[in-house]
Amino acid sequence: MEPLRAPALRRLLPPLLLLLLSLPPRARAKYVRGNLSSKEDWVFLTRFCFLSDYGRLDFRFRYPEAKCCQNILLYFDDPSQWPAVYKAGDKDCLAKESVIRPENNQVINLTTQYAWSGCQVVSEEGTRYLSCSSGRSFRSGDGLQLEYEMVLTNGKSFWTRHFSADEFGILETDVTFLLIFILIFFLSCYFGYLLKGRQLLHTTYKMFMAAAGVEVLSLLFFCIYWGQYATDGIGNESVKILAKLLFSSSFLIFLLMLILLGKGFTVTRGRISHAGSVKLSVYMTLYTLTHVVLLIYEAEFFDPGQVLYTYESPAGYGLIGLQVAAYVWFCYAVLVSLRHFPEKQPFYVPFFAAYTLWFFAVPVMALIANFGIPKWAREKIVNGIQLGIHLYAHGVFLIMTRPSAANKNFPYHVRTSQIASAGVPGPGGSQSADKAFPQHVYGNVTFISDSVPNFTELFSIPPPATSPLPRAAPDSGLPLFRDLRPPGPLRDL
């Protein structure tokens, strides 16, 4: 029996994995070090996708000579190798080793018998150790004990050296989108300045500006993380988590803004009903908690030995379901707004069409990523698609709300200093909040100024207030305004 499979070498520790030609899934770290002490005979260390002719593994392993002998196994991502042995409880060590083809140099024996493994015996405080320079999986008769340090690289370029093959291009993509979103944010601030001068800077537009600003911060932290990662192969996981939280926050702010606009807030009405406020609060709380659960699930339960996409989890599928529910709500809100205010069709028709695509883009992307994109290319492709979806959403809204006379889709036509009119008296002398309102006047009875964001009153209905202005005759049904001057024509930029 060949030395590697001698009875004395009963335990093996496979992982380091992925090989030269098969470009496997993803890896978390390109510089890995630590101490391993386990009773298990098969322990996963890390995962990395090497490029043919460029991929290189530099390592240092040390373990007590009494634990001899241990091996490092390099698995291809071929279905007959890594997927066939990982978490295969019905296979023992020899069975897991048997799928490897020795002629491909996939086994590194960490003993002095193999000079190319770089092993030598050293003594330290009376204990003899085997110190080697090359490796990845090990065997012993009573568990594993190992100090390890590995540097996994793809070429010498700053943009590829520490990156797994499935991560190529992520840093360049993030930098590109960061510059684009900075431009969008500054344009939104400029448009906001113009709108504020015309008293048309409404809460929903401020939410758009906030979403764009948070998106910029998110991409900035992603670039910092990947830039540091490209430098040292380690990165700062806290920075990446912060970037993900900001990315999710931007998405949630934008989603809330879309639902509010669909319901006509700041376009056809100045307030959301009490029932609508409660529904929005419950929905957004549920959506936020699900996002948090998804991040925790990804950090704590994703198996680094497998390639798992963010949405490939119960929390991820829950988010997809909430996205579909949000679209149904969005459709209903837009249809109701159009039914009561058909004069708003120039805004709502393209608005509905554009964001129908956006609502479906996220779940469709998740399904394609889970089932249609090769694992070794998934992370970089999904990153680009996800950022493209966010860019589409922000770019469309920026164009639709640009304050230009040529913009026929401009949604805002009531000043922030105006209060809404009283409607035509309904049965019993009550006033209707939904019917017979003049064009470009809000649907609810009261509209507060939002020159400064007032999030505490965003969705609530204020108590009736006595107006200091003279009131019209009870049966006149004429609207009352604090400022009766129209906003005036929009100027081209």
Curated annotation (Swiss-Prot):
Glycosylation sites: N35, N444
Record InterPro entries: GPR180-like_N (IPR053880), GPR180/TMEM145 (IPR047831), GPR180/TMEM145_TM (IPR019336)
Region annotation (Disordered) ranges: 464-493
Subcellular location, record wording: Membrane
Keyword ATP-binding assigned: no
Transmembrane annotation, as ranges: 9-29, 175-195, 207-227, 241-261, 282-302, 318-338, 349-369, 381-401
GO BP term, example: response to pheromone
Membrane topology: Multi-pass membrane protein
GO CC term, one of those recorded: membrane
Keywords: Glycoprotein, Membrane, Transmembrane, Transmembrane helix
Pfam families: GPR180-TMEM145_TM, TMEM145_N
Keyword S-adenosyl-L-methionine: no
Name this polypeptide is given: Transmembrane protein 145
Organism: Homo sapiens (Human)
